[in-house]
């Protein structure tokens, strides 16, 4: 198969990606048989586990960046109760370098801007080239950042959820 997989989930993803059901890969890539796989493979995930992996990756690959594609600041009870602050703090502790938004915009544009200006300033770049003001279509956020990785300049372009204006 050439190129990238189309948006597929569950059994369809496993079939197209040629991944056997019941394997560790199937557990990592799908929601299928989650209870059974959780019993077999034990606890996975969580920010403590993620922090360990990020530290290992950055130690073994100097110049590596941690990118966040969104869906991070919302979705849990604690995120709801703290208006996303618990997850924002976790992102900073993990060492996220560059982020774009998805469901973060459900917090409201003012809250998102507040986080970027207060919590992320000088620490995390927030990029979203496709989020524009409704009146004149001006960019709301930086569209991209240039980061040098092992001497090579690389552009990281932010592509937020394209239906943000009507979904949130």
Which residues are covered by each model-predicted region?
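Acidic, metal/ion-coordinating pockets
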Residues: 1-168
